[in-house]
């Protein structure tokens, strides 16, 4: 099979592991699911046994044709041959997202599903190190994601679970959407603030006196142990100092 390395995938084929994953998804008969990466259709088939409707998006032509043949009689499954990064999720429909995503595109895809979809729950299989980076509020990605979703690990998936076997372990994570911590009208300011904050360009955000006031108000004694809630407090101080509130 000719592979586009950028979009290459490591497939889950073990029935035991697939069943463990399905159990963690806690799907209902009324659920509509969007799957990222049909692959060979192993997970797709199991999703369709429980959910009302599964729409599965696959870019690789060979895999799309293979899965189309395998799933052609399954009325609960709709296959779409498209790049997930170009796919438009519905605005007014309730749905969940499930995906075993390519490691190389983890950042792009997680941003896509969090910021360009309205999914209530998102389940992704990602590289273990990437999962840890999503929790790191000293990084841009962590500070952006936390405004919209909470993130938790559901299952650890050793490299032996996949074919071909990757060099790293993976995890199944759940992203649960919550009310945004940053209203839309402040989003551009927040992304600017975060870009400066993670690079410690504090002078681009505050005067010396403002910085000390913001730290005091957020009760920050040590910047190396700052919490997400404290960063939000500091951002609110930034808005106040700039007459935005």
Curated annotation (Swiss-Prot):
Annotated keywords: Antibiotic resistance, Methyltransferase, RNA-binding, S-adenosyl-L-methionine, Transferase
Record's GO cellular component terms: cytosol
Signal peptide: none
Catalytic EC class: transferase
PANTHER family: DIMETHYLADENOSINE TRANSFERASE, DIMETHYLADENOSINE TRANSFERASE-RELATED
Protein family: Belongs to the class I-like SAM-binding methyltransferase superfamily. rRNA adenine N(6)-methyltransferase family.
Protein name: rRNA adenine N-6-methyltransferase
